[in-house]
From Swiss-Prot:
Phylogenetic placement of the source organism: Eukaryota, Metazoa, Chordata, Craniata, Vertebrata
Name of this chain's protein: L-dopachrome tautomerase
Cofactor detail note: Binds 2 Zn(2+) ions per subunit.
Gene coding for it: DCT
Induction: Induced by blue light (415nm).
Residue intervals passing through the bilayer: 473-493
Pathways involved: Pigment biosynthesis; melanin biosynthesis
Example GO BP: ventricular zone neuroblast division
An annotated Gene Ontology molecular function: dopachrome isomerase activity
Binding site for Zn(2+) B: H369, H373, H396
Glycosylation sites: N170, N178, N237, N300, N342, N377
UniProt disease annotation: Albinism, oculocutaneous, 8: A form of oculocutaneous albinism, a disorder of pigmentation characterized by reduced biosynthesis of melanin in the skin, hair and eyes. OCA8 is an autosomal recessive form characterized by mild hair and skin hypopigmentation, associated with ocular features including nystagmus, reduced visual acuity, iris transillumination, and hypopigmentation of the retina.
Assembly: Forms an OPN3-dependent complex with TYR in response to blue light in melanocytes.
Topology relative to the membrane: Single-pass type I membrane protein
Length: 519
């Protein structure tokens, strides 16, 4: 019997299985009453009547709005997946916060705001290159990740069964699990890409709510924002910011795979992390997708083995280059039909890595984001497991920095994002799965400064904006040649004019036209 099967019978170190509900929801809403009534509108504070902070004007309990516009792409089923019309399979009513208030009970502020009434603009946190961090900043970041792997999430839980098993076998035991802060981060990513469960051994794989479409950029942006806020609260530092890894080195080595950062390779088994790294003991969750499909169940947070990277045999593979970043940032269209992995001249598809960096489609080539995941290999190679590796955090922080730079350069209107006929989950107004309370793609289609953070980074400008030396030299040489040609032409015309003045009278053709007459 595989370790996973045993795991369904035992509690795990990071996630303790409890009676609960399915989906990623606040622990306080995981009661039979809340699930039967399909309402998650918790009170704020001790006063039972203060639902959603209504007594302070922070919010109200309202009907969930879900996008019903048509989608395209390979997912052709209807009413078969609990993520359709998210989150209405679970809750019809949730807190709708007003102004700058946010959170499942409107007890938080929107990203970028602070104060008792969320009335003050918060100074943006600055995401820096991980190689530029001071030793103290580096230790704070790595230590926060390690603490997040061990500390149970204070507010949210994960599901252990699909939607038809929501209340357990007897209808009175909602199925959910407590989980560590970091494993919760991993589970969110897994849940967004998992297969549709149709029956034992009958997965429907043509579905992905966070990749292969426009939502790739907004989904991962919100994913990072949630982790960043969780880590800020975990270590008690509101100015803490996630760093980024500038992977555009063009090299065939991972410069963050060191014991000072995310761990070097173990000498006796290069697929494992060096014992000198704190991450050598990290175990993965949500890695056994085929087993979940066979059992018709969900990842329950059970640990399934050590974190792995495997660059062996990939010495010929190189990371993206600065030219790739420049080419990608020169693409002016955010996305193009069919808004999928075969879209061409799409900034989103080039950044995600299904197009070449210049926007042309080549099914044999990976670029940018996809290339880096493939380069790292191991746990990082598959979407459902990739977030287990903490490199995922800094990889996606840099990907978001590229997206943010594009947003600043082109300032796209909201309708640059398709309102309909993107793959399921990728329409502009779709609630991103499985975030709760609901948040649409459109709400994250902003520049980072509007969300309370920014990047300390200088990304390469396009060739059109700043010509390189070869281009500049060609322009100068061309101008000189043109000037010389013009000088020769003028000299020749002057020579002909002078010659004409000495033509003998016998060859002169007289004209009766006066100078004052029109030609």
């Amino acid at each position: 019997m595989s370790p996973l099967w045993w795991g369904f019978l035992l509690s795990c170190l990071g996630c303790k299985i409890l009676p609960g509900a399915q989906g990623q929801f606040p622990r306080v809403c995981m009661t039979v009453d809340s699930l039967v009534n399909k309402e998650c509108c918790p009170r704020l504070g001790a006063e039972s009547a203060n639902v959603c902070g209504s007594q302070q004007g922070r919010g109200q309990c309202t009907e969930v709005r879900a996008d019903t516009r048509p989608w395209s792409g390979p997912y052709i089923l209807r009413n078969q997946d609990d993520r359709e019309l998210w989150p209405r399979k679970f809750f019809h009513r949730t807190c709708k916060c007003t102004g700058n208030f946010a959170g499942y009970n409107c007890g938080d502020c929107k990203f970028g705001w602070t104060g008792p009434n969320c009335e003050r603009k918060k100074p943006p946190v600055i995401r820096q290159n991980i190689h530029s961090l001071s030793p103290q900043e580096r230790e704070q970041f790595l230590g926060a990740l390690d603490l997040a792997k061990k500390r149970v999430h204070p507010d949210y839980v994960i599901t252990t069964q699909h939607w038809l098993g929501l209340l357990g076998p007897n209808g009175t035991q909602p199925q959910f699990a407590n989980c560590s802060v970091y494993d919760f981060f991993v589970w969110l990513h897994y849940y967004s890409v998992r297969d549709t469960l149709l029956g034992p051994g009958r997965p429907y794989r043509a579905i992905d709510f966070s990749h292969q479409g426009p939502a790739f950029v907004t989904w991962h942006r919100y994913h990072l924002l949630c982790l960043e806020r969780d880590l800020q609260r975990l270590i008690g530092n509101e100015s803490f910011a996630l760093p980024y890894w500038n992977f555009a080195t063009g090299r065939n080595e991972c410069d963050v795979c060191t014991d000072q950062l995310f761990g070097a390779a173990r000498p006796d088994d290069p697929t494992l992390i060096s014992r000198n790294s704190r991450f050598s003991s990290w175990e993965t969750v949500c890695d056994s997708l085929d087993d979940y499909n066979h059992l018709v169940t969900l990842c329950n947070g059970t640990y399934e083995g050590l974190l792995r990277r495997n660059q062996m045999g990939r010495n010929s593979m190189k990371l993206p280059t600065l030219k790739d970043i420049r080419d990608c940032l020169s693409l002016q269209k955010f996305d193009n039909p069919p808004f999928f992995q075969n879209s061409t001249f799409s900034f989103r598809n080039a950044l995600e890595g299904f197009d070449k960096a210049d926007g042309t489609l080549d099914s044999q080539v990976m670029s940018l984001h996809n290339l880096v995941h493939s380069f790292l290999n191991g746990t990082n190679a598959l979407p459902h497991s990739a977030a287990n590796d903490p490199i995922f955090v800094v990889l996606h922080s840099f990907t978001d920095a590229i997206f943010d730079e594009w947003m600043k350069r082109f300032n796209p209107p909201a309708d640059a994002w398709p309102q309909e006929l993107a793959p399921i989950g990728h329409n502009r107004m779709y609630n991103m799965v499985p975030f709760f309370p609901p948040v649409t793609n459109e709400e994250l289609f902003l520049t980072s400064d509007q969300l309370g953070y920014s990047y300390a980074i200088d990304l390469p400008v396009s060739v059109e904006e700043t010509p390189g030396w070869p281009t500049t030299l060609l322009v100068v040489m061309g101008t000189l040649v043109a000037l010389v040609g013009l000088f020769v032409l003028l000299a020749f015309l002057q020579y002909r004019r002078l010659r004409k003045g000495y033509t003998p009278l016998m060859e002169t053709h007289l004209s009766s036209k006066r100078y004052t007459e029109e030609a």
